[in-house]
Curated annotation (Swiss-Prot):
It is found in: Secreted. The presence of a 'disulfide through disulfide knot' structurally defines this protein as a knottin. The cysteine framework is VI/VII (C-C-CC-C-C). GO terms for molecular function: ion channel inhibitor activity; toxin activity. InterPro entries: Conotoxin (IPR004214). Residues 20-37 form a propeptide. The lineage of its organism: Eukaryota, Metazoa, Spiralia, Lophotrochozoa, Mollusca. This is Conotoxin VnMEKL-0223. Its main location: secreted. It comes from Conus ventricosus (Mediterranean cone).
């Protein structure tokens, strides 16, 4: 029974190693991290002046950090 368990574990390790080699290995997680790190939080966008805060004059939704331009003023949420 122990030999069968060890054999199954070795087979699982070999199969997972082969899948990593064929799938590109560590490239995919790095690409995912780069994609996620490009996004800025609302606070970062506001701090860098890329969007307007609450109750500031606006003409488009994209100008507001909240994404809501109602009645020419940025909404809070």
């Amino acid at each position: 029974m122990q030999k069968l368990t060890i054999l199954l574990l070795v087979a699982a390790v070999l199969m997972s190693t082969q899948a990593l080699i064929k799938g590109g290995g560590e490239k995919r997680p790095k690409e995912k991290i780069k994609f996620l790190s490009k996004r800025k939080t609302t606070a970062e966008s506001w701090w860098e002046g890329e969007c307007s805060g609450w109750s500031v004059y606006c003409t488009q939704h994209s100008e507001c950090c909240s994404g809501e331009c109602t009645g020419n003023y940025c909404e809070l949420f």
